[in-house]
């Protein structure tokens, strides 16, 4: 099943639509990682919200790239400062050894990267790896957005959305390849 995700926009957020079949959605070039065979369990947005409310001992791990985390991230989240998702396997090797026995809830924008990221962490010996079902955007949709700081970068013309899923004051400069808050 492929979940249908909807958000509304007053402008056309995509310049074009292109449908094609790809071997991997998020390319890592690692054939030993197959989310159909191994992936972390899901935590719903409401469950993550409750973990924050109850001050549970959980490590919240951001699997997104550094330019995305500059726009916003969860309260007390571990930001791996990734240049690209391909850096993720090396980045988790730098995490403290005690994290391997802690509960980790990872997240990304829509949940796709976490399918692979959770498999990578489980293969690397992390014992309790979970992923935020539907990603940050589903968290915004199903909670009041509390515990999120800033906005969420999206991969379309809107650039970033707030916790109410409204377009925010960011533009993307295609000359310097930077996000600019206006």
What are the roles of these predicted feature ranges?
Residues 24, 64-69, 83-87, 111-113:
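Short acidic/polar capping segments at secondary-structure boundaries
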Residues 56-60, 76, 103, 128:
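Short active-site oxyanion
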Residues 180-182:
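Conserved small/polar residues in nucleotide/adenosyl-binding loops
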């Amino acid at each position: 099943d492929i979940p249908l995700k909807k958000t509304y926009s007053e402008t056309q957020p995509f310049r074009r639509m292109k449908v094609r079949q790809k071997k991997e959605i998020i390319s890592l070039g690692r054939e030993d990682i197959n989310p159909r065979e191994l992936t972390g369990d899901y935590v719903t947005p409401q469950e993550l919200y409750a973990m924050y409310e109850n001050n549970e001992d959980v490590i919240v791990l951001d699997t997104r790239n550094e330019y995305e985390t500059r726009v916003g991230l969860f309260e007390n989240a571990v930001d791996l400062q990734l240049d690209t998702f391909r850096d993720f396997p090396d980045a988790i090797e730098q995490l403290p050894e005690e994290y391997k026995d802690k509960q980790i809830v990872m997240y990304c924008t829509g949940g796709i990267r976490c399918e692979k990221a959770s498999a990578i962490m489980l293969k690397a010996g992390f014992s309790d790896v979970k992923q935020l079902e539907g990603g940050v955007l589903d968290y915004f949709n199903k909670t009041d957005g509390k515990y999120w700081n800033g906005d969420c970068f999206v991969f379309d013309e809107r650039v970033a959305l707030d916790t109410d899923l409204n377009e925010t004051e960011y533009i993307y400069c295609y000359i310097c390849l930077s996000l600019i808050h206006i």
